Regions:
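Juxtamembrane interface at the cytosolic side of transmembrane helices
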Residues: 1-15, 131-180, 287-312
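Extracytoplasmic/ectodomain regions of membrane proteins and secreted proteins
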Residues: 12-133, 174-292
Length: 312
């Protein structure tokens, strides 16, 4: 009878823990984030951030003073000129001091999570997706329940089956390193909780839109207008920028690709926010522990059933 209770408990826990929703949510999130957490992706993201940071520094400390002098303005007058005539450039430059540390912190956090992510990515194994976990859990519960039912009719045979299945439920998670993987997944969950929010997604979208508009207006409107005022051709202006302001010149070429990569990362966060909300309350290490304890209990009850049947 107790064996049946354990089996029913495993099935009930699957439903109570919402594992049939958690499994797909976990798998979808892991699959979508996997490309963003490669070593190369992290290095590229750091390079993109460094490029934006260099533009911010160069614009305020070199480009503004130099262009102000060329146009016979003070730096303050030039900044006012930019704000009035190229508001998107002004807004973008104003957003960079906040956006750069935000994205740098986000990328650093993701980089730090890579070992935990790799471990969680192997739940239950590297070749089996997480969507198999709830089915395996329910299957184990039903099997244990049926074994308990059989033990009522044939204590010796049912007890032997309970002993074998119980030991499997105890040993297989250890063989698959599930306790460690589950603990890593829980730690990953805990580390992401402070940052993985709707506010993060909304702020990142807004910041990228502002910076993207800055790059577009700078390249298509501001620089051609400045070239006219400086009596330069567009080609001469590009040469002038490349020689004197290399970070800005390079950013004009690389910013579209950089922003596309950042937008792709933000899209991954946005698309998986509901998945994260689904799995966030679930403690996987606790569930694995319950499964193993249940296996040990079933094995013990099976052994007792065998001994009792022999005495009779």
């Amino acid at each position: 009878m107790l064996i049946m209770v354990v089996g029913a408990g495993l099935v009930a826990l699957t439903l109570i823990s919402n594992l049939f929703a958690v499994g797909p949510a976990f798998e979808n999130l892991i699959t979508d984030f996997r490309p963003a957490l490669t070593e190369q992706s992290i290095k590229t993201a750091h390079a993109d951030i460094a490029g934006l940071s260099a533009v911010q520094t160069e614009f305020s400390t070199k480009l503004v003073p130099a262009l102000s002098q060329q146009l016979k303005m003070t730096p303050e007058q030039f900044n006012g000129f930019v704000s009035q005539n190229f508001p998107k450039v002004a807004a973008g430059m104003g957003a960079l001091p906040t956006a750069i540390p935000t994205f740098d912190g986000l990328i650093n956090t993701l980089d730090q999570q890579r070992p935990l992510f790799a471990s969680a990515d192997a739940i239950p194994t590297e070749s089996l997706p997480a969507t198999t976990v709830p089915w395996a859990w329910v299957g184990a519960g039903i099997l244990v329940f049926l074994i308990g039912l059989a033990a009522l009719r044939s204590p010796k045979a049912g007890g032997a089956a309970a002993l074998v299945v119980g030991l499997l439920l105890l040993v297989v998670p250890l063989a698959l390193s599930l306790p460690g993987k589950a603990a890593d997944a829980d730690q990953l969950n805990a580390n992401l909780k402070p940052i993985y929010t709707q506010a993060l997604v909304d702020n990142a979208k807004g910041g990228l839109a502002t910076i993207g508009a800055m790059g577009t207006e700078m390249g298509t409107t501001m620089l051609p207008a400045l070239a006219t005022q400086l009596k330069m051709t567009p080609e001469q202006l590009q040469t002038f920028l490349g020689a004197n302001f290399p970070a800005t010149a390079q950013a004009l070429q690389t910013m579209p690709a950089s922003l596309e990569r950042f937008n792709g990362l933000v899209k991954v966060f946005d698309n998986n926010l509901s998945n994260y909300e689904t799995l966030k309350p679930v403690g996987l290490a606790r569930l694995i522990l319950i499964l193993m304890v249940s296996g040990g209990l079933v094995a013990a009850l099976g052994a007792v059933s065998i001994v009792t049947a022999r005495r009779e």
